[in-house]
A protein has these predicted regions:
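Partner-binding and oligomerization surfaces adjacent to conserved cores of proteins
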Residues: 1-187
């Protein structure tokens, strides 16, 4: 007798404004999400750490290079976080895209929320730095995907491949706009 074990895919959520139609269509048509470089992240305390002069400078160099050569795609574990709808989905006039990540080359990190910044040690990696956020952001329930190292970020903008399961529209999306998006998506 065979055991039929079914593994459900992990579903994550990308909150989006609908103001940039081209970006929305890129996501829906190409099944890809954009990543941002560290310097493009919206939290001014993003990626901070406490440096100790006892730590070899090569560790510090590796962290700085890692910040500048990897893209970050931020997703959430939940689709019903009010502040996420407000901050990232244009005050409920946007959408939340439910996705299953299909990329095999991006690294998954569960974000850890802390009251203090990371202390740099000999074993600290870029992943250790980029997976930590201030505890005030804990409501986001964030999962991050890090791209492979990109040698020339001026010429390359890698995207995270996903399978879209559904699109949830905010309650403030006007019915006419919703119907247009529905036609586009089902075409």
């Amino acid at each position: 007798m065979k055991n039929n074990i079914s593994i459900e895919p992990e579903l994550l959520y990308k909150y989006r404004s609908l103001e940039n139609l081209e970006r929305f269509l890129d996501i829906v048509i190409d099944n890809k999400l954009y990543g941002a470089l560290y310097k493009e992240m919206n939290d001014p305390m993003e990626g901070y750490f406490q440096y100790s002069p006892d730590v070899d400078k090569s560790v510090l160099t590796g962290i700085w290079e890692g910040k500048n050569k990897r893209y970050i795609c931020s997703l959430s574990k939940k689709s019903n976080i009010g502040l996420m709808w407000t901050h990232y989905a244009n005050e409920n006039k946007g959408c939340c895209i439910e996705v299953e990540v299909t990329s095999k080359t991006w690294e998954r990190l569960d974000v850890e929320y802390k009251k203090t910044i990371t202390n740099l040690s000999e074993t600290t990696t870029i992943e250790d730095i980029l997976k930590v956020k201030a505890s005030m952001w804990e409501y986001e329930q964030e999962v991050r995907y890090l791209s492979p190292v990109i040698a020339n970020t001026k010429k390359s903008n890698p995207q995270l491949t996903v399978r879209i399961h559904r699109i949830i529209f905010g309650y403030k999306v006007k019915i006419k706009k919703y119907n247009r998006f529905k036609k586009i998506i089902s075409a």
